[in-house]
């Protein structure tokens, strides 16, 4: 599932923006 991969790969990005 692309959404699952996007969630895992996007997690560091969200934490970096936080």
Swiss-Prot record:
Cellular component GO terms, alphabetical: extracellular region; synapse
Modified-residue entries (Alanine amide), positions: 18
UniProt superkingdom: Eukaryota
GO terms of molecular function: hormone activity
Cellular compartment(s): Secreted
GO BP field: chemical synaptic transmission; response to light stimulus
Record carries keyword rRNA-binding: no
Residue ranges of the TM segments: none
InterPro entries (UniProt xref): Pigment_DH (IPR009396)
UniProt keyword terms in alphabetical order: Amidation, Hormone, Neurotransmitter, Secreted
Principal location listed in the UniProt entry: secreted
Cystine residue pairs: none
Record's function text: Causes the migration of the distal retinal pigment into the proximal end of the pigment chromatophore cells and thus decreases the amount of light entering the retinulas. May also function as a neurotransmitter and/or neuromodulator.
Family statement drawn from the similarity comment of this UniProt entry: Belongs to the arthropod PDH family.
Protein name: Pigment-dispersing hormone
Annotated organism of origin: Procambarus clarkii (Red swamp crayfish)
């Amino acid at each position: 599932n692309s959404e699952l991969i996007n969630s895992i790969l996007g997690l560091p990005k969200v934490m970096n923006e936080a």
